Amino acid sequence: AAKPHDNVANGLGYLWNPTKVLMEKTTPAAEDKPREIVGAKALEEAKAEVAASGGALKLREVGVMEQLWNPSLWLAAAGQIFFSRSVGFSVIIVYASYMKKNDDVVLSGLTASSANEFCEVGLGGLITVPAAVAFLGVAGVAGQAGVGLGFKILPLVFSKMPAGAFFGGAFFFMLFLAAVTSSISMLQPGIAFVEESLGVGRKASVTILGLLTTFGTGFVLYFTANLKALDTLDFWIGTFLIFVLATIQIIIFGWKWGIDRGFEELHRGAAIRVPWIFRPIIKWICPGFLLSIFVMWLMKEIFGYDFAKGSMGAVSGYVTDLFGEKSNLPAQLSMALVIAIFVFFGLLTARSKAYARAEQGLPKHD
C-alpha cells in the first residue's frame, strides 16, 4: 500500500527531531529501559497499551533540553568527532612527526576538517536518513545505527537510479578502498612504535602487529553473540578512551606545551592565521568543557545520577557488563584483552632505548 507520508521531505524533518515520546514503567527497576514511540500509529497503540496497563505504564515526552542534559550524548558526539579527525589516539601524532618544519598545518587542517564534515553530514546524513525514511518509514529508522543504516538503504537508493548497478558498484568499491587505506593508516603508528621500542625492522614489526591484530579480530568474531565483544571494545576504546586521550592532549597543548609556543609553531609556514579568540578557547574553554562532560558522565553512568530528573537512576549497561551480578563474560574478556595489550605495549615502552633517551632529553639516535 502507498505511504505518502514516507518521503524525503519528512525524512529531512526527522533529522531535526528535538522531542521524543517514551513509554516506561511507572516504577521502573534499574534494568528497565524506556521504549521510544515513533510515528502516529505507534503513538495511538502506545496510548491504548498504557490505558490497559492499569497505571503500570506511562508515556513521557522528552524535550530537547532534557536530552542535552544527558552526558552520554555529549561523550558519544565528541568521541565520533575525535575519531573522524584522528584526534585522541596516536595516528595524528605519528603522521605529524613526518611533516617538515614549515609545512602549513593551519590551512591543511582546516581543509581536511571542512571536507570531512561536509562528507559526513552533508553527503552522509542528509542522503542516508531522508532516504531511509522514504523506504522504511520513521518507525523503521528509529534506533538504528548510522553505518548499518547506510548499508541497508543505499542499495535501495541505487536500485531506483538510472545505471544504479554501475554507480552502486563504484560507490561500494570506493568505500572498500577507503576502509582498507584507513585501516593501514591506523596500523602505521603501531608499526612505528614496535620498530622503535624493540629496535627491529619493518618486516618484523608488521609481523608482530599482524599477529596481534589477527588475534583481536578472531576474538571479536568468536564472541559474535549479540555483538557484545565488538560493542564493548567499540565503546570503551572507540568512544570513551578516545575522549579521555583527546582531553589529555588538549591540556598538554594548552598548558604543558604552552599556548604561546603552540601558536608560534602553528603559524610557522601557515598561509592563514588562526584568530586570537581560539587561544582562550583551547586553553580554558575546551578543557573545562571536556572535563565537565567527563565528570557528569561518571556521575550518571557509574554512580547512576540522572541529571534530567535530579534523582538516582540506573547505572550504565557497559559498567554492569563488567561488574556486579549481571556481568557478561565476553565483555569482561574484551576488557581483559585490552588491559593485556596495554601492559604488553607498556613493557615495550619501558625497555625501549628510544624512550630512555627521550627521558634523558637526548635525541632518538646517536
Regions found by a protein language model. Name each.
Residues 1-9, 70-73, 100-104, 127-139, ...:
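Transmembrane helix-loop junctions in multi-pass membrane proteins
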Residues 116-127, 213-220, 242-249, 341, ...:
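Alpha-helical transmembrane segments of multipass membrane proteins
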Residues 179-183, 241-255:
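Generic alpha-helical transmembrane segments
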Residues 186-200, 225-230, 251-277, 356-358:
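Alpha-helical transmembrane segments
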